[in-house]
Amino acid sequence: MAEINSLSELSMATSITEPHENVVPVHVQKLDSQGRAYATGKRKDAVARVWIKPGSGKIIINNKEFDKYFARPVLRMILRQPIVATNRDTQFDIVATVAGGGLSGQAGAIRHGISKALTYYEPELRPILKKGGFLTRDSRVVERKKYGKAKARRSFQFSKR
């Protein structure tokens, strides 16, 4: 590399490689051999594997209808948020396997997986899902228990006498 002795030489050396303006990252459709988009979603201790394919809007979780797997309406609403936000209610069939955690974490993991799979299937949906916060991994996990404490932060009962 040539020696640079002055500021003018430095500006000449750096001006040769100007960055391209208006560079937009290209998102390509990612499908498997059966025409499905696959993604994994995580929330707390739950990990979900999600496949989406064109269909009638059927959702199957661990080989059960999602109405039977998630009895609480709040969990069903959480799970359907990315589909409703993108107006794809009846366009995709969703198959998910989920393990670990409780029902709330599992619903969040499936929601995260559906969002990622939708972006793999239709990359133009990414800005909508990103704006809604569906693509962001919720990194909050349970705080570990500390020794000398009853729980993570709760102390044992204190007695003066």
UniProtKB/Swiss-Prot annotation:
This is Small ribosomal subunit protein uS9. The keyword Ribosomal protein applies. HAMAP family: Ribosomal_uS9_B. Gene3D superfamilies: 3.30.230.10. GO terms for cellular component: cytosolic small ribosomal subunit. Disulfide bonds: none annotated. Belongs to the universal ribosomal protein uS9 family. SUPFAM superfamilies: Ribosomal protein S5 domain 2-like. GO terms for molecular function: RNA binding; structural constituent of ribosome. It comes from the Bacteria. One of its GO terms (biological process) is translation. Keywords: Ribonucleoprotein, Ribosomal protein. PANTHER family: RIBOSOMAL PROTEIN S9, SMALL RIBOSOMAL SUBUNIT PROTEIN US9M. InterPro entries: Ribosomal_Su5_D2-typ_SF, Ribosomal_uS9, Ribosomal_uS9_bac/plastid, Ribosomal_uS9_CS, Ribsml_uS5_D2-typ_fold_subgr.
